[in-house]
Design a protein with these regions (language model features):
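Surface-exposed binding patches on compact interaction domains or structured appendages
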Residues: 1-13
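Extracellular ectodomain segments of secreted/surface proteins
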Residues: 2-4, 42, 48
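Hydrophobic beta-strand core residues of beta-sandwich domains
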Residues: 4-6, 21, 229
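Generic recognition of long tandem-repeat/solenoid scaffolds
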Residues: 11-16, 83
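Well-ordered beta-strand positions in beta-sheet-rich domains
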Residues: 11-13, 28, 38-42
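Surface-exposed, short loops/turns at beta-strand junctions within beta-sandwich domains
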Residues: 17-24
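Surface-exposed loop/turn motifs at beta-strand-loop junctions within extracellular Ig-like
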Residues: 18, 33-37
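Domain-level detector for secreted/extracellular nuclease and nuclease-toxin modules, and
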Residues: 24-33, 44-262
């Protein structure tokens, strides 16, 4: 651990070297200032793994393997008095022009507020190159396929900013319209019914490697003619505390008996 005091902005920067030891290591740092201020910091640094693209900063994230076809990203937005609350994290597969999973927290605070889907527009995710995404700002996928949200817009009424981010192409997959408007919508509602005083953590995923139902084409196109494969399966995985009223984060829970996975 090394520290550097930048006199220009009077900020103490703490730097860590890569941990190649094969085991986690910990360090405690006491910072004392001449004006009497003091802070104690404790760090736990996991061993570096060059097969993992990003370390899981949130407990519900799937493993994030390094793959040239995957783009990992997190969007942040306004939630209450916070301007930088996490909205969702995704793994975008450039081969399918879609995310294979979208992970997000869900609480009652996310589902009420000023966000209005009528004020949102479908469009490109600004953090991913346009040419890698489905062009959904021009309209839905061709054929009988809706622009199906992985993180539902109804789960982000907390602010217009968070609502708008759910309309990015990276949050969409081509869904057969009857499925999207019926069974998928029912499932989304059931997930919302699982919310509690503690945070519910959700991972929604699309799987492209199975056998298509006879009513589903192997692929469709967007309005620019780009090929967009259709998922063969979808899933939702949920994690929360059993009581729903612990007032603790998932990573603060010490016993698996206190958790509920669905």
């Amino acid at each position: 651990v090394t520290t550097v005091m930048e006199t220009s902005d009077k900020v103490v920067y703490i730097y860590f070297t890569k941990n190649v030891s094969g085991i986690s290591r910990e360090a405690s740092v006491d910072v004392r200032f001449t004006d009497g201020g003091a802070f104690s910091l404790h760090f736990c640094q996991h061993s570096y793994d060059d097969t993992i693209a990003i370390q899981r900063m949130w407990p519900e994230l799937p493993t994030c393997p390094v793959d040239d076809n995957y783009i990992y990203n997190t969007h942040y937005g306004k939630l209450g008095i916070r301007s930088d609350a996490r909205n969702y994290t995704y793994c975008f597969d450039i081969r399918n022009r879609a995310s294979i999973w979208v992970a997000y927290p869900l609480h009652r605070d996310h589902m009420s507020g000023s966000g209005n889907r009528n004020n949102s527009d479908f469009g490109y995710d600004p953090d991913v190159e346009d040419n890698l995404q489905a062009a959904l700002g021009l309209g839905s996928y061709n054929g009988w396929y809706d622009r199906g949200h992985q993180l539902p817009a109804a789960d982000r009424k907390c602010s217009q900013q968070m609502m708008d981010q759910t309309f990015y192409s990276t949050n969409m997959t081509p869904q057969q319209y009857k499925f999207n408007q019926n069974k998928w919508g029912v499932l989304e509602g059931r997930v919302r019914n699982m919310t509690c005083n503690d945070t519910l953590y959700v991972v929604t995923g699309a799987y492209f490697g199975g056998q298509h139902h006879s009513s589903i084409d192997a692929s469709t196109t967007d309005r620019k003619g780009n090929k967009c494969p259709t998922p063969t399966h979808y899933f939702k995985a949920l994690l929360r505390t059993k009581s729903g009223n612990t007032g603790r984060r998932i990573d603060e829970i010490t016993s698996a008996n206190q958790l509920r996975a669905i």
